[in-house]
């Protein structure tokens, strides 16, 4: 999971995104008015993860005006535009996520994360794949074994929704953030009849506050 710095101006966004791709993308030209997958992948530090690319793109445009976002989307090439339509994020409050969230879909949530203590009474289980010989099977393990887990609080209702990220990422700040990820299934217990819930596997986040103008911008 990474913290990214959103674009503040449309010209900055276009210059960054219409970059010609990596050195081996010989058919892709910079500043040609077309943004393709190789160019988006370069600025996002990604290669073939199309779903994650769209998350990066959407979150990076957070502070642009609606008409400016439309200009950028209009410059995506045919294939990337279809990818954008396929993976466009649900924009939800934490209080809406359990009811409206769609498993395996991208989502962007806003709230204040509170780290769940591993020794607390929180229980939740996820399926993880394992290889048995040449056969892949799935077992259930506590989510806290694989992830840092948080309750993301909805400021309007004080309701919370579970978000999580890999343990090799830095702990999220205890402040209002905008976070992007993918909805995944979470079970309340190991029993087959256990309640099925959801959590957001977080990939990117930004501060909810717009940066001060005229400061240099660096994307991670």
What kind of feature is each model-predicted range?
Residues 1-220:
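OB-fold and OB-like single-stranded nucleic-acid-recognition modules
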